[in-house]
């Protein structure tokens, strides 16, 4: 299993997380912590804390920590500022984040309750930009600008452990002769005749590393994650002793990486925040049993109904005694009142 198969923090939007899901995963680093932040869209009037990591934004209510949200950077479509109406601050400039997760759009509005502080905007925007510009650490890449003057263009925090000449890429019937690099974050191969014919495979995207028999003899076979396209790549390394040594080294580096991934999001605040565990309020177990089966209402307040072309037809509500717009499938009037309260 690749590290990516277990990674959800940067590629998901989740609500009402458990205490375990609020904790940082291996490789996740807390970059900034902002107190007195209101979730104006979903919990207007509720003072909370915003946590900025290298993978996501977390917000939780200070009054009730199980009221929370996690927004992965990979889901973000747009970040901007706009005027919002806060119950605690009135009309003020707020951070607006539009996201898309599993074909559903959510929008979030966060307001800093400390007047005159731009830190909410600068922190989130800068870290998201750092995430967007460091995708080479995390994404499977074909035909990228990897090589300069026959040398691998190293990423920050990247170190080359081995460079092997005369490695055949077995993607075609004849094979292509090239150079193979093993680093602490990825595997890179490029053709000697044309260095723009290349591939970069981060350990994050590697599902399996094996030695298999092929029509060219024994070969190194790397299978990438389903998210990257499920590629199966073969490389011929001679002699066999060097092949076995390389596979052993790659497996060892992959194991080290899996224990402590390098995601490449490099951004530091002048003041270091406390660890996330120290900042998250412990969740208190209530005597009330909460039935979460089939509950679709927790995040209804965050829906960005961007696909709605016109108002839905009005229907008479016996509960309210007046005509209302027909609700979307799966939602009830009672559920909407629960979100409001």
UniProtKB/Swiss-Prot annotation:
Q: How does it assemble?
A: Part of BBSome complex, that contains BBS1, BBS2, BBS4, BBS5, BBS7, BBS8/TTC8, BBS9 and BBIP10. Binds to phosphoinositides. Interacts with CCDC28B. Interacts with SMO; the interaction is indicative for the association of SMO with the BBsome complex to facilitate ciliary localization of SMO. Interacts with PKD1. Interacts with DLEC1.
Query: What disease is associated with this protein?
Result: Bardet-Biedl syndrome 5: A syndrome characterized by usually severe pigmentary retinopathy, early-onset obesity, polydactyly, hypogenitalism, renal malformation and intellectual disability. Secondary features include diabetes mellitus, hypertension and congenital heart disease. Bardet-Biedl syndrome inheritance is autosomal recessive, but three mutated alleles (two at one locus, and a third at a second locus) may be required for clinical manifestation of some forms of the disease.
UniProt keywords (A-Z) are: Bardet-Biedl syndrome, Cell membrane, Cell projection, Ciliopathy, Cilium, Cilium biogenesis/degradation, Cytoplasm, Cytoskeleton, Disease variant, Intellectual disability, Membrane, Obesity, Protein transport, Sensory transduction, Transport, Vision
Query: Which named protein is this?
Result: BBSome complex member BBS5
Kindly give the InterPro entries that the UniProt entry links to this protein.
BBL5, BBS5/fem-3, BBS5_PH, PH-like_dom_sf
Q: Which GO terms describe its biological process?
A: cilium assembly; heart looping; intracellular transport; melanosome transport; motile cilium assembly; protein transport; visual perception
Instruction: Give the protein's function.
Output: The BBSome complex is thought to function as a coat complex required for sorting of specific membrane proteins to the primary cilia. The BBSome complex is required for ciliogenesis but is dispensable for centriolar satellite function. This ciliogenic function is mediated in part by the Rab8 GDP/GTP exchange factor, which localizes to the basal body and contacts the BBSome. Rab8(GTP) enters the primary cilium and promotes extension of the ciliary membrane.
Q: List where in the cell it is found.
A: Cell projection, Cilium membrane; Cytoplasm; Cytoplasm, Cytoskeleton, Cilium basal body; Cytoplasm, Cytoskeleton, Microtubule organizing center, Centrosome, Centriolar satellite
| UniProt entry tagged with the keyword Protein transport | yes
Family under the similarity heading: Belongs to the BBS5 family.
Q: What's the further remark here?
A: BBS5 may interact genetically with BBS1.
Record Pfam families: BBL5
- UniProt KW Transport keyword: yes
**A GO term for molecular function:** phosphatidylinositol-3-phosphate binding
Q: Which GO terms describe its cellular component?
A: axoneme; BBSome; centriolar satellite; ciliary basal body; ciliary membrane; cytosol
């Amino acid at each position: 299993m690749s590290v990516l198969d277990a990674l959800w923090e940067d590629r998901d939007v989740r609500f009402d997380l458990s205490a375990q899901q609020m904790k940082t995963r291996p490789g996740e680093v807390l970059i900034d912590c902002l107190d007195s932040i209101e979730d104006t869209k979903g919990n207007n009037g509720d003072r909370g804390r915003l946590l900025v990591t290298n993978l996501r934004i977390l917000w939780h209510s200070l009054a009730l920590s199980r009221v929370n949200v996690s927004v992965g950077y990979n889901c973000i479509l747009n970040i901007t500022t706009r005027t919002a109406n806060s119950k605690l601050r009135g009309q003020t400039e707020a951070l607006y984040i539009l996201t898309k997760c599993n074909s559903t759009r959510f929008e979030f509005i966060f307001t800093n309750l400390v007047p005159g502080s731009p830190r909410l905007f600068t922190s989130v925007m800068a870290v998201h930009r750092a995430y967007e510009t460091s995708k080479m650490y995390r994404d499977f890449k074909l035909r990228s600008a990897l090589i300069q003057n026959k040398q691998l263009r190293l990423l920050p925090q990247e170190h080359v452990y081995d460079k092997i000449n005369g490695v055949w890429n077995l993607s075609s019937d004849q094979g292509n002769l090239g150079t193979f690099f093993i680093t602490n974050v990825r595997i890179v191969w490029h053709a000697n005749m044309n260095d723009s014919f290349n591939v970069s495979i981060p350990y994050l995207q590697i599902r399996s590393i094996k030695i298999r028999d092929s029509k060219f003899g024994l070969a190194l076979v790397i299978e990438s994650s389903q998210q990257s396209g499920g590629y199966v790549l073969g490389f011929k390394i001679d002699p066999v002793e060097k092949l076995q040594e390389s596979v052993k080294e790659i497996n060892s580096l992959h194991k080290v990486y899996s224990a402590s991934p390098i995601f490449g999001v490099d951004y530091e605040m002048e003041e270091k925040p406390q660890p996330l565990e120290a900042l998250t309020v412990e969740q208190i177990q209530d005597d009330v049993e909460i039935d979460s089966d089939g509950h679709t209402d927790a995040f209804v307040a965050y829906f960005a109904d961007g696909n709605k072309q016109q108002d839905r037809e009005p229907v008479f509500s016996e509960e309210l005694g007046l005509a209302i717009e027909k609700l979307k499938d799966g939602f009830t009037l009672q559920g909407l009142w629960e979100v409001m309260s």
